[in-house]
Structures are given as C-alpha cells and as structure tokens.
C-alpha cells in the first residue's frame, strides 16, 4: 500500500527544485550513476591545453569548460536553452569564454574554419556538416553522447513497453561524421549502472533529462510515479542503465 503522504512530499519537493544548468548535485545521496572509463573531462582538458581556438557546443551551464585548467586564448561556447545561457555566462566568466545563445535547429553562427577544436558533451543533436565547416583543416571534434536506449528501464517504468530504439547508435554517428568529410579516429561505448533511492530523485531526473520521458509532468504520470514509489519502498533502489559513447573525429 502506498505511503501517500511520504510519496507526495517527495514528489512535491522534486517538482519545486530548480533544474537550471547541467549539474546533478541535487541528486547527491539520492541517486548514483557510473562514469565512463574514458574520463571525458580529462580528455577535453588535454585537448584544450593544445588548442588555439576551441568551441563547446551545447555547453549546458558550462560545467565541463569551467574545470579546464588551461583554456585556449579563444574559447567559445554555444547554448540553445535560454535558462542555461545566463548560467553558463556566469560560470564561464572566470575562464574567459564567450557564450553565444543559438537556435538549436539553426547553423553554427561562426565563419568557416574558425576552430581547431570542437567539443560537445551530451548534445541534443550533432549537425555534422556544420561541425566540419567550422573546424580548421587538421582540427578535432570530441564528443561524449547519449547512446540508444539510455535509461530504458526508467522510461518503460513510466511509459510501458517501448519499441527498440532507432536513434543515437554510435555506428550511425560515425557514418554521419564520415559523410560530412570527417575522419573518425576513436569510437567507444559504455553501459553505466544508475540507481534511484526515492521517487523524488526520479521526478527531478525526469524533469531535468527531458528525453527520458518526453512531455513529462507530475500530474500526467502521477499514477505511474506512485507505483514506482511502492516498488522502491518494497524492493530498494530502482536500477536503470545509461548508454554513452565517445566519438573523436578529425578534419583532413
């Protein structure tokens, strides 16, 4: 039987919590997720130290760039979600980055061959032709991306059974990069265990990571949330698996 008061309190708390930026500190102690062995932030820092002009596409709140110890002289970031733009500008001021608000479906607003490094963590989509266009000859694109079927167990707990995922396969990304004239030099994938200790953590995650359950609202899925609360209370933390892949490509 559902402990309705406890469930509703947890849900209400998570529904009211801020979700700006791309940090996940709110989940500390309430959810866990394994990290890929390739250590994306370290790879970015290594390549930034050798770059003259770099671009971070879909920077979120600027969390990755803010940790780069030796940023290049010219450092630019784009962000397409308005609430994140000001967060990123505040975060990245200290590393001297320029944050440009963009239309997520539009072209990159930069001249051809503007950057010798383009990076992107968890982009909404990758426009491979635009990426190739703004890279200088010999330049590098490095990206950690969401893989096909990520958090499928959580999606199905809310939505019910789903068809096999059709998008975000690493092989498709590599083929698209090659079609745009880039040369793929590294392609890796990882399956990462994630746990949610209470229904509040689930609600906050679904509000934040909007592609897990498109159109998610508490009111729309309250019945499913209460059922999942019962499951967590009875069985312990809910487990799902995130899919990630790393792709690195160069412009000849």
Kindly give the residue locations of the regions a language model identified.
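Conserved alpha-helix/loop element of class I SAM-dependent methyltransferases that forms part
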Residues: 19-53, 61-67
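A short glycine-rich, Lys/Arg-flanked "PGG" loop and its adjoining helix->strand segment in the class I
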Residues: 126-142
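Class I SAM-dependent methyltransferase SAM/SAH-binding core
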Residues: 52-108
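A short acidic, Gly/Pro-enriched loop at the edge of an enzyme's catalytic core
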Residues: 105-117
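Conserved Class I S-adenosyl-L-methionine
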Residues: 183-252
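N-terminal, positively charged/glycine-rich alpha-helical extensions of SAM-dependent methyltransferases
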Residues: 1-25, 34-35
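Short, glycine-/aromatic-enriched active-site segment of Class I SAM-dependent methyltransferases
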Residues: 146-164
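Short alpha-helix
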Residues: 165-181, 213, 220-223
């Amino acid at each position: 039987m559902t402990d309705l008061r406890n469930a509703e309190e947890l849900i209400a708390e998570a529904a009211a919590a801020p979700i700006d930026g791309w940090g996940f500190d709110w989940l500390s102690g309430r959810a866990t997720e394994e990290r890929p062995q390739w250590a994306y932030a370290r790879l970015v820092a290594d390549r930034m130290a050798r770059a003259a002009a770099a671009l971070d596409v879909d920077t979120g709140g600027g969390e990755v760039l803010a940790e780069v110890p030796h940023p290049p002289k010219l450092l630019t970031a784009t962000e397409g979600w308005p609430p994140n733009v000001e967060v990123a500008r505040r975060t990245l001021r200290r590393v001297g980055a320029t944050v440009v608000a963009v239309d997520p479906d539009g072209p990159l607003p930069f001249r051809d061959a503007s950057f010798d490094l383009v990076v992107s963590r968890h982009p909404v989509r990758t426009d491979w032709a635009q990426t190739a266009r703004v890279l200088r000859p010999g330049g590098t694109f490095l990206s950690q991306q969401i893989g096909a079927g990520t958090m499928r167990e959580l999606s199905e707990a809310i939505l019910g059974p789903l068809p096999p995922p059709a998008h975000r396969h690493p092989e498709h990304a590599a083929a698209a990069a090659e079609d745009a004239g880039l040369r793929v030099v590294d392609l890796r994938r990882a399956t990462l265990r994630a746990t949610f200790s209470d229904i509040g953590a689930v609600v906050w995650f679904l509000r934040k990571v909007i592609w897990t359950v498109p159109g998610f609202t508490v009111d729309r899925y309250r019945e499913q949330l209460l059922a999942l609360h019962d499951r967590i209370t009875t069985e312990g933390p809910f487990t799902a698996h995130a899919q990630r892949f790393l792709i690195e490509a160069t412009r000849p």
